[in-house]
């Protein structure tokens, strides 16, 4: 569990006290990442990232926010379980670390916004594309990792937890409609939260900021294919095989792994 934070002026104007604000956001999410803290601010002062790290893979060189050769930056929470396979596919010569964080940067280099379709894992990240002056954010298919954001006076704030956004909201108000939904369904619908000005990036969605506009769109949805051509025994064996494969992927780590029973 790591903590991500980001600030971007939609017009890429200089954000007052950018570095200090990122520090505040990191401090409010310190419990999410006891192993390290990092921050990056663009020279223009119009965009910056923060990060609190819980070290799992590549303890020595996986610090964030992370930069690639093209000047792109990423802040990321989660784990890309198929990162070893993606490293091979993308070309090991492009990598300078063993971190799955760098896989996100190199996948974006090759596939752009379609990179999320290649990831097998749980993730929430924000990536700054220097050449296109674009912010690209994504959340995993099932929303295992959290991602919240708000826009105040033309400035976008994003974080792993709502508490890191509250200092920047001038007037914190309860969204009564979302509150009714929560009491009914135990969740808020359509990306709403219990706070009027704060939104949740839905599972399987990306958020893109370019030319001052924010676009949110779905990149994945669950679908079912009916199959009447195989026996129950076939499906039992297939499910077992898929579960064993999934567990093997989930156990990849550079530190000891535990599980609740």
Feature names for model-found ranges:
Residues 1-261:
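Cysteine-centered catalytic environments shared across enzyme families
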């Amino acid at each position: 569990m790591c903590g991500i934070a980001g600030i971007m002026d939609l017009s890429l104007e200089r954000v007052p006290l950018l570095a200090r604000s990122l520090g505040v956001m990191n401090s409010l999410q310190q419990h999410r990442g006891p192993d390290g803290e990092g921050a990056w601010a663009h020279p223009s002062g119009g965009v910056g990232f923060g990060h609190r790290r819980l070290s799992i893979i590549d303890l020595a060189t996986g610090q964030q926010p992370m930069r690639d050769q093209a000047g792109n930056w990423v802040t990321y929470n989660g784990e890309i379980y198929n990162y070893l396979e993606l490293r091979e596919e993308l070309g090991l010569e492009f990598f300078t670390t063993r971190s799955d964080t760098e896989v996100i940067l190199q996948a974006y280099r090759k596939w752009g916004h379609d990179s999320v379709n290649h990831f097998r894992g749980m993730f929430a990240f924000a990536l700054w594309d220097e050449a296109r002056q674009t912010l690209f954010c994504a959340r995993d298919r099932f929303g295992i990792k959290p991602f919240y954001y708000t826009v105040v006076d033309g400035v976008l704030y994003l974080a792993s937890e709502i508490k890191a956004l509250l200092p920047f909201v001038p007037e914190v108000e309860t969204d009564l409609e979302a509150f009714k939904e929560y009491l009914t369904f135990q969740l808020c619908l359509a990306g709403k939260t219990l706070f009027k000005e704060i939104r949740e990036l839905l599972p399987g969605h990306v958020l893109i900021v370019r030319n001052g506009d924010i676009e949110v769109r779905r990149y994945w949805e669950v679908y079912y294919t009916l199959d009447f051509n195989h026996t129950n025994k076939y499906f039992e064996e297939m499910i077992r095989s898929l579960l064993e494969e999934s567990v093997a992927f989930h156990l990849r780590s550079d530190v000891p792994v535990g599980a609740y029973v």
